[in-house]
Amino acid sequence: MEENKSVAEGKAATGSLKESEETSAQNGELGEPEVQQTLKRTNSTESGGTGQKPPEEAPRRRFQIPRKSRDKRALQVISSGSREFEEILKILHSSYLDANSKASFSYKCARLVHNEFLEKEFTEKRRQLKFDGRLDKELVESYVFLLVDQEQMHSITEKGLHVGHSRMTTLGKPSMGVYLSRYADLLQANPLETGTTGDIFIFKVIKGKMKFVFDHIRNNQMDSFSGNGGLDPVPKHECHVLKNMNAVTALLGYRAFERTQYYFYEYGFDEVLKRPRHVCPYAVMSFGYKDELATRQPPLPTSGPVSFPTERSFDRSSFTLWRGQLLNKGKLLCYASLKSTSGPFIPYRLPERLDLDIVIKIEVIKKSIPAVLFYKETHNKPNEAKHGGIYSRLYEVVEKTRTGSHLQGLLQKIERENLALVKPLDDRGFMFLYFPSPMTSAYASAKTRLLHALFIYHESRLTQPVANVPVPPSFVPESHEFMPEVLTFVPALHFALHKSQSDTSADFNDVVEKHSRIYLKRRAEKLNKFKEYVLKPYDSRLDYKKSLYVAPRIKGHIESALRSYLFGSEAYTIPVDKAKEMLKENQRFQQFSPVSDYEPVEDDHDSNKYNKKCPVSYVETNSEKSSESTDWDIDKINGLINLIQKKKQSKPETDEPSGVGLKRKLDRQSEKAWKHRKCEENVHHDNEPGESAQSLISSLGGQDTDLRQETESLSSECIKMLLEKLADSCIDPAMAESLKTLKQNSTEELPSQKLKNLSQAHDTEREGAGQDQHIVYNDQTTDNQENTTCLSEEAQQAEGSHSDHSVLMEEKILDPPLESASPCPSNTAGNNCPAQGPNSLDLEMHWKLIPIAEANLTEEQLVYVSTEDALPNDPRAGHKRRGSRYSPLHETERQRPRHDRDYCRSLTTPSRTERNMLQSKHCHNGLIENTVLEVYNTFSEQLHDVLKQRDVPYMVPAAPPLLSSDDRVLKLSDCLCEQVSDICVQQYVDDLHTTLDSVVAAHINSCAVSRTGSPVTEIMAATEVHTFHPKQTVTEYPHVHEHFHVNDLHSDVREANPFSADHVYKVGEENAANGHALSHNSRDLSQETPEISTSGVTDLSEPHLAISNLINQMNPEVFNNLVKIITHVNKNSVKFYVHTEEENAICQNIKEYLLKLGNTECRPEKFLESKTKADKLLIIIQNEDIPNCIHRVPALVLLKRLPSVSFAGVDSLDDLKNHTYNEIFVSGGFIVSDESVLNPETVTIDELKKFLMFLEEINSPDANWQWKIHYKFHKRLKELGRLNTNALNILTLLTTYQKKNLVEILSYHLSCDPQNQQAPQLECLIKLQVQYMKQRHVLFLTEKDAARFPDYCDNGIVVTRMVDFMDNFSNLIGHHSPNNEEQRLSQLTNQGDETAPGEADSKEEEDMSLDSEDDTPPIEVCTDSWKPESQKQNISSLLELVDKDQTESPSTLNQGKTPTLDELQPITPVSVAGSTTGENSVSTGDELGSNTKDYNREVNLSHQFSHFSLLTHQTFLGSMYPTLTNPSQAEICFMNSYSQLTEPETSKNSERKQK
């Protein structure tokens, strides 16, 4: 019964096995081998059941087939202890390329794929292949792998693996098949990093018939970016595989991932299927990767004199602090890393490559360093160890590659020879690499193979917290120079940042700006809603962190915020200027009325200082006065005066307000007496009737806001007091009597017209008598002891008691340096006040210019009179010494003692009452004058800056004119004239005009003047005399004479008729701006030495007067045409240089031919020294000399930078005549680099991308740029690309740009590409320069020091770095931008002139051909009427051209053949299209200043015109005009041209056709 029972059980088991086999066969889970194995196991079990029950029956239960899962999900999770999980692990482990990968991969979760449709498709494909007669080895099932993410995993599980998921093209097009990995540990191109996690998708595949493909790396890499590379699928095949796939033996091998791929595809009837059916998803396994060593073995117990604890915790986490390469004498030993178990700290930052070439014996090291530092137990603590004053840290060196025995061989050598490798570090530090076994016997017994790295240094490398750093006792507060108000703006910024978190209405910076303005506005207005943000102090306790890493926080918004900041950083920026503007807009100043009481908070400090300097009695008196006066007190007035002074200052530099009421200190009085005197004077002020604020403002030049409240009572009182004072102080009895009469009449009401005339009379008196009597120095204060001509000592003391703060404030406005050089200056103290004493009767003339009550003076009486023509007592001659501060009289005045100057100034300064009353309600020296002065000062400063930048010598700058009214100037309106003041420049213009006329009449050479009424001759002669300097002045300033002479010459020639008032006015303004002080000084000196001046003027004016006589006889149209012809000839003239090693007949013929054409031979050195931008240089070289001589052209690098330099190669003279020469160095350039630029260890792929993109930007069809790489460097990149990812990326990048023709790989060079040669050498670069001679620039790119290549620049090669090439590209190749400063200077000096036609086109690149036919101007006949302005401008242009050509080409003056009168042809006038007046370009003073030295010799006219090659419609090389031999021939030539203008229009047309 038992036997039957066992048999029945066996049959039942067999039936269940058959059912499970059928089910598994339908699902495709088990193949035929598995079914056969299962049947074998069943049969053995069956046969064993016939006998007794075997003892192995109990263990048989472990192999029972589980019941079919009811889970219908696509991914079914498998437990880690199940049989399916173990089978998947076996599949993975058996598919490793490296056996050590088993310890690096850890698998966590496995999931089986359940997709019946895909499984049936797979089974159907297998049956189809078997039906087609495929071999059994082609039908074998295997497993392949793919690294996927979560999205790909679910898509593949449901739909299968479709084509197009990969970008590789190694085996075929990715759009027609799928790529899968052969090995389970080689899942991507880059090595896996430690800690990487992911999912591996396992596919069950049938390889079928495989196509073996050769490795076409170049084609694959070039087509990898387009995605169209690779082979097409082959019919009747299912897979592509690389032929040398089995050659890959290491994970880090060259292109190991690409070379171990399978390429699966499937053909349908007429197309490739999107999903190969013989690729079936099988399972998904989650993995984690760790590159750790195997568990270390604990060391044996120590035995020796030094005992250390032997227990060691191996669970401690380690930190990798450095990864890189270890090299020995440049040879790679291994890839290694430094690991530490004591903490993530390393004392030094090591480079990626460590070259260890120093070896020291261990015994030598022990003598200098304590041996205890080499023990690992010394460095158990996380802090650095210290013994014997030496700090140390110990790390372990771990080999990273694990593929060779390089490191093990190194360790054996160190152990055997008892050595240590040494690497010197910064700050007297060292790193020792040693094998630990020689140190102690304990390590010798352990036999550990870990190399140790010991860092030793003399100072601790730990960073101390801020709290532990001692603070120095003298703490200097931080200064915010870029924005002093930053402490005010930072709280506003905090407020705006807080508010902007909830405000997303606009860009971030706009929102921040809006809320910042709100905060600042509330702060300024002090609203109730305003709450000031106070910056909290930093808590130093935050420096002490308990743990190294902070607790995790929610950072979901960090990614979006960083992305918006990186791609739109401008939205997070507020410029400093805008922040300052926001602060300035919200500043609130205290508003007040000029006539109301006001108490400025900011001026309390000044008033307190003022009160501190006064005695107690003075303060008490002021308090009494302020209590009596209901309108104002002295403190308020002082504050108001300070404010007005700040507003009215013409320059920002002002003195202390406390010095406002100070008096000039006298040497006769002590400091104490001076202060006491000052207090007494202020006490006298209190006894005077008080003044209102309206009168004070009116006296300072201001106006009341309500004009209807003004009365005339104060004016009458002012006049009465003034006349009384004048009558008492005047010596002349007649004048005193007249003043008394006026005083009696002043008690009655004066008509408005009389008051106006009287006010103007006082103004005229101030102008004529001194015009500078109320000007004081800014750093000094005037003494209030004012004196007139014959006052007694008692009267002087009485006058000294009167003072007025307003007058003193007005006196301090004008600056004394400006006053001394004013274009309309006043008399200085030295001129008005002789040192004889106060009783001198010469002072009477100061009062002779006071008109008495509507007195009328003629025009001649008010005009300036020179010293020679004036009477002894004529006060009009007092102007002669006004001028530059460097005049001898002014120097004498400056060197006098201070009390003399004070005394003289006290004699000429009006009294307190007089000055107070002279300031009427409508003061003429008020606000308008100061506004004009401010504008004038700004203009002067800008002009001085331009002159300094252009290195133009100039004398003391001109000061603003002293503005005052004048009866002789017509008034626009009487009402308007009362409110504003007139600008007194007419008297100065008349003075200048009269002086110029007198100088011209005295010194002009009458015999040289052909027309007395010619404005050109008069202005030229007057200008030369006006700007002439004596010999001693020229010696002291050698360049000043040349500059000002030519500048004034051409500026005056450009002006209109000199006899018109407008012309004189313009000349006066120009002289005042360009050097009036120098001209006045020269005028004074010329009057003192007339014989020197007369002789100098005669010598200087002879050449120009001779030319002027000739030109004055010409018709203006003829002259215009001649000037334009000469201008165009100079514009198209080309200098040349023939470069040859030895002189030959060809070069000599070329030189002679070009010299006959009027061109100039010029060496490159001299051409570079000249600064003329219009010059052009053509360098000619024979074609056969180019390989050996082209790089020896002097200054070749500098010449290439200039666009006006061209190069031509010729074989004979005919090449120049027929335009068949070889153009050299046309445009563009090429770059050659050395090994430092393509070093993968130092250069990143981003830097090269940026460089190549820049090269692509500058490349154009007109200027081709290319990077030429030597074969040696390209080969090295391919070798390093197998192991170095950066090298592979660089190689791919170069290949991409090689297709764009921006990179060229040079062929093999025998001179520099061998291994023992350095590439590129200088000879190689010179050959490349000759080989690519059409490209203009040759650049040698290196990251080394440029000083190591000194000879490269001498051979036309520019040495630069990659960054410098991109940043300074324009400077390297010579791109020049126009000079803005020069344009400003030309606009400033040539205002009102129009631009000549040649100037408008000067910026365009001109034709460099020596015989250019382009741009030949058409022949026109000018029929404009006579215009003096045009003739004067033409004279200036002609003189400029003549002088310029004399200087530039003196060697070509007499080289042409001298023609006879019969050979002379009439010159047809040629003009460039445009107007004929005002279009001639005016040369600057720098160009003409160098030519003035030629003015002192007799200039022959033939020399001036003989070297011009005049252009017609014939070619520049085809015709040569005859030279002029003497002035008579020139006149005949010009007359012939003039006669052509009188012929009918038909003759002009016929003549034009003939030409």
Curated annotation (Swiss-Prot):
Keywords: Chromosome, Nucleus, Repressor, Transcription, Transcription regulation. GO terms for cellular component: heterochromatin; nucleoplasm. Residues 35-47, 692-702, 744-761, 1448-1458 have a biased composition (Polar residues). One of its GO terms (biological process) is negative regulation of gene expression, epigenetic. Residues 1402-1417 have a biased composition (Acidic residues). Residues 61-71 have a biased composition (Basic residues). Residues 667-688, 888-904 have a biased composition (Basic and acidic residues). GO terms for molecular function: chromatin binding. Residues 1-74, 645-711, 744-773, 870-911, 1390-1462 are annotated as: Disordered. InterPro entries: PIN_TASOR (IPR056242), TASOR (IPR046432), TASOR_ab_dom (IPR056243), TASOR_DUF3715 (IPR022188). It is found in: Nucleus; Chromosome. PANTHER family: PROTEIN TASOR, SET DOMAIN-CONTAINING PROTEIN. Belongs to the TASOR family. Component of the HUSH complex, a multiprotein complex that mediates epigenetic repression. The HUSH complex is recruited to genomic loci rich in H3K9me3 and is probably required to maintain transcriptional silencing by promoting further deposition of H3K9me3. Component of the HUSH complex. This is Protein TASOR. It comes from Xenopus laevis.
